[in-house]
Amino acid sequence: MAETAAGLCRFKANYAVERKIEPFYKGGKAQLDQTGRHLFCVCGTKVNILDVASGDLIRSLEQEDQEDITAFDLSPDDEVLVTASRALLLAQWAWREGTVARLWKAIHTAPVASMAFDATSTLLATGGCDGAVRVWDIVQHYGTHHFRGSPGVVHLVAFHPDPTRLLLFSSAVDTSIRVWSLQDRSCLAVLTAHYSAVTSLSFSEDGHTMLSSGRDKICIVWDLRSYETSRTVPVFESVEASVLLPEEPALALGVKNSGLHFLTAGDQGILRVWEAASGQCVYTQPQMSGLRQELTHCTLARAAGLLLTVTADHNLLLYEARSLQLQKQFAGYSEEVLDVRFLGPNDSHIIVASNSPCLKVFELQTLACQILHGHTDIVLALDVFRKGWLFASCAKDQSIRIWRMNKAGQVACVAQGSGHTHSVGTICCSRLKESFLVTGSQDCTVKLWPLPEALPSKNTASDGDLIPLQAQSTQRCHDKDINSLAVSPNDKLLATGSQDRTAKLWALPQCQLLGVFSGHRRGLWNVQFSPTDQVLATASADGTIKLWALQDFSCLKTFEGHDASVLKVAFVSRGAQLLSSGSDGLLKLWTIKSNECVRTLDAHEDKVWGLHCSRLDDHAITGGSDSRIILWKDVTEAEQAEEQAKREEQVIKQQELDNLLHEKRYLRALGLAISLDRPHTVLTVIQAIRRDPEACEKLEATVLRLRRDQKEALLRFCITWNTNSRHCHEAQAVLGVLLRHEAPEELLAYDGVRGALEALLPYTERHFQRLSRTLQAATFLDFLWHNMKLSPLPAAPPAL
């Protein structure tokens, strides 16, 4: 069985996390700096800062209270970032260093819902859920204004772009816009024309015009000189954001007339440009295929010429403002990752299916993201053909799609098929060549789909008409949902796993039943063929993995160790080992021959639905319900090489230590013995040094020359020595040197020094009492010696 492959490959012993793709945006505000190089977005208790060019997370800013961030804003000069948390605290950040420059109470009686800087970057306005609007001077560090009068949550605040006019605009749940004068400390006007929540305010470059948008499907142009409505434009969608465009970007989009133009983003999921004077839509972004994605946010970075939009499923899209050409895509939050696969001939990309109709393709080196639209319901499973250019997906919309990546790394849908009557939950591609694929559905049937020869090549990724797929055969295979399919390496066999607790083996292409694998106590989540042996692996909700012989359908081995359902299993090390993932969030590496789990990997916090191994068998990718995607690297050889190097270094150092001890060069031997972690040898060296008449000076000089980590190790050794009355003198001698020559602040900085002192105190007191008693006894003996008087000898008898 797997023993034959084991002799040709090295067993794996460990995997290490090489890279993580984690959520960095979970809804709320997202903002670009003026240069367009950094992206700021909210993720729970943090504000994450991304490098737009590389997609890397530069820094995460989190307040000490660790409460959710309710609002934030970056100053126009890009120097100051202010965040507000649910704990009613405002934090002023030097965001480039990641440090808090100032922390103060918001004084609001409810969380801050909105925030905005003025054009000078000195004044900050905060709108609270308590209906109050406050203005702060962040340079002089005091509150300047407090405005009341808004009913309910103030969800929108904005300063007039001309700082000399000292005007502040706010909007609350009453759908009106209030204009506040900072100079008079009063409300100048209340603009009432919307019939639903106002979602955004935008100002013209001359400061005389303001545009407001709302969920009442209208945008209103206001004259700020008279505070009257200039134009009401029906846009026929609930608008979440609108932006007044500078003249140059509007003309670049093919708009012929001059004048004010504005862009809207809303529940239709497309960007549209409107002419303010006529109220006509002059540009409509082409609609993407698939389910419509509502846009929840839109902002323009004028200096950088970039437009940032956010979709309802937390994807962030960057457009070039002049042409509205898509520049970058970021997947802020993948929700529950249902499947993940390597893509490309060199496994340079990964595909991710999550709780969304959209697929996400990441380039592993740069984490550049492509968002693929096509399915109209949640994508459930993925599989990749052997060469890596072509892959397939299936979804709850009862359809399947074929996608191809071209040499430039761009992915497009090339074929589509439908025919199942329920959600398509699993899909599997042919292994030898791109000839067919198999799908399994909740309708308990399996369909075989031959691939047409007219598919585009890898040199192109056409967005033209999709090629229709036709099912060649349909077979009812199980009595319950089919959860997994696997095609054998020679494309001759098909394995199916179902909720009915059985796996079945079928002959292809006729879909003829060959046998049934029975033995699991609960439904099966995954089935996999061995790449080298005639063996099938099954993973079940009963927490076990079983290996089955294809010849007689008998169970060869059972692997137990997961505390919950085993969701995925994969053969690694040329079929000699198994890698499994479970709903307990753990990955386990099993050796088939010994039937043992050699390593348990814990990096996920919830179910691990996706597991796939690379072509070279040196990497694995996992995705789970915790929205994490983790790239694992096989570090067995690296760890073995590191261990071998350590052993060789230990041998060399041990020989050097033996030579030093033989030559009685104790001072040099002390540091070497400490680095080798040899407490007994260190004790022997100190005892030898103390036998020297000049022991105190030599011991002090030697100990003080040690590095800090060596002193920490020596202190740990002293704890052990101090427990023994025969060795306590050496421990006390070392301790005395450290206490006499190290400042208390330096000692407290030692690793574990508090615990060390607590361990030293009781034995030191015991030794002190014992030595005190010994000294008293010796003093008493000395006293007796000096005070003893011999009685006179008796006189000799007289001689006769």
UniProtKB/Swiss-Prot annotation:
Sequence ranges of the WD repeats: 64-105, 107-146, 149-190, 193-232, 245-284, 290-329, 332-372, 374-413, 419-459, 477-516, 519-560, 562-602, 604-642
Gene3D superfamilies in the record: YVTN repeat-like/Quinoprotein amine dehydrogenase
Record bears the keyword Repeat: yes
Any one annotated GO CC term: nucleoplasm
PANTHER family (UniProt xref): TRANSDUCIN BETA-LIKE 3 (PTHR19854), TRANSDUCIN BETA-LIKE PROTEIN 3 (PTHR19854:SF15)
Assembly and interaction partners: Part of the small subunit (SSU) processome, composed of more than 70 proteins and the RNA chaperone small nucleolar RNA (snoRNA) U3.
Protein name: Transducin beta-like protein 3
Organism encoding this protein: Rattus norvegicus
